[in-house]
């Protein structure tokens, strides 16, 4: 809704005569609101909240781990060993934990269900890491096991 007003009725008499033409103005724009409208600023930058830095760092860490896995998997094939086995165990467990954490965030609703799902996720991740470390220590290790599977 707009009303047709003369700008000169909103301005003082000492303003330039160029403002005497007819313009379409919104109804709430009265003389006392004109100063506020002229001086209001629009900020297009996003608001920075206290937790946004932590979320950004978490996202960066997830992406860094994903990129590191792209190099770690071929390196594990070329240079198998205990250090590579334990690095794979930690990286794969953390990558899986973060991925399943996003599934829990997206698809589990309700306060109690979320707490149970997160507790289960931490337990699953801890058991996965412990199992991979046990396999690395007491058996052939991840790298050699994958090589043995490929040789079948």
Curated annotation (Swiss-Prot):
The pathway is:
Carbohydrate metabolism; tricarboxylic acid cycle
Query: What is the protein's given name?
Result: Succinate dehydrogenase [ubiquinone] cytochrome b small subunit B, mitochondrial
Task: Indicate yes or no for the key word NAD.
Answer: no
Family classification: Belongs to the CybS family.
- Chain ranges sitting on the Mitochondrial intermembrane side read 79-83, 136-152
Q: What is the lineage of its organism?
A: Eukaryota, Metazoa, Chordata, Craniata, Vertebrata
Which residues take part in binding a ubiquinone? 107
Q: What gene makes this protein?
A: sdhd-b
Q: Which residues take part in binding heme b?
A: 95
Q: Name one GO biological process term.
A: mitochondrial electron transport, succinate to ubiquinone
General function of this protein: Membrane-anchoring subunit of succinate dehydrogenase (SDH) that is involved in complex II of the mitochondrial electron transport chain and is responsible for transferring electrons from succinate to ubiquinone (coenzyme Q). SDH also oxidizes malate to the non-canonical enol form of oxaloacetate, enol-oxaloacetate. Enol-oxaloacetate, which is a potent inhibitor of the succinate dehydrogenase activity, is further isomerized into keto-oxaloacetate.
Predominant location: mitochondrion
Region forming the signal peptide: none
The residue ranges crossing the membrane are 57-78, 84-104, 114-135
- Record key words, sorted: Electron transport, Heme, Iron, Membrane, Metal-binding, Mitochondrion, Mitochondrion inner membrane, Transit peptide, Transmembrane, Transmembrane helix, Transport, Tricarboxylic acid cycle
What's a single GO CC term here? mitochondrial inner membrane
User: In its keyword annotation, does this UniProt entry include Mitochondrion?
Assistant: yes
Q: Which organism is it from?
A: Xenopus laevis
